[in-house]
Amino acid sequence: MAKFDPRNLPDLVRRPILTEKATIMMEQDKYTFEVTPKATKPQIRAAIEDLFQVKVVKVNTALPPRRKKRVGKFIGFKPQYKKAIVTIAPGDVEKIRQVLFPEV
């Protein structure tokens, strides 16, 4: 992903991460997403701004350690993923909540 191609931006963000910690961080306008491991912060910022039509203030990334997975006598690892914590501008919070959590 060396080139900055706007057509590839939607493929960078895989899914939102909805854990207890991520839910608490949503109250501080911080949203957590799983992204491709090779995605950079500027690419993540552009993808979130393009997908949700919001202003991104800050992007923090983390590569959590791989977890062991055992099947019988064989030991393997779960796939590597990258976590992006995106801070949204206070005025745009309702836009992203409507997309992530539509009312039924």
UniProtKB/Swiss-Prot annotation:
One of its GO terms (biological process) is translation. Coiled coil: none annotated. The keyword rRNA-binding applies. GO terms for molecular function: rRNA binding; structural constituent of ribosome. GO terms for cellular component: ribonucleoprotein complex; ribosome. One of the early assembly proteins it binds 23S rRNA. One of the proteins that surrounds the polypeptide exit tunnel on the outside of the ribosome. Forms the main docking site for trigger factor binding to the ribosome. HAMAP family: Ribosomal_uL23_B. NCBIfam families: PRK05738.2-4 (NF004363), PRK05738.3-4 (NF004368). This is Large ribosomal subunit protein uL23. It comes from Trichormus variabilis (strain ATCC 29413 / PCC 7937). The gene is rplW.
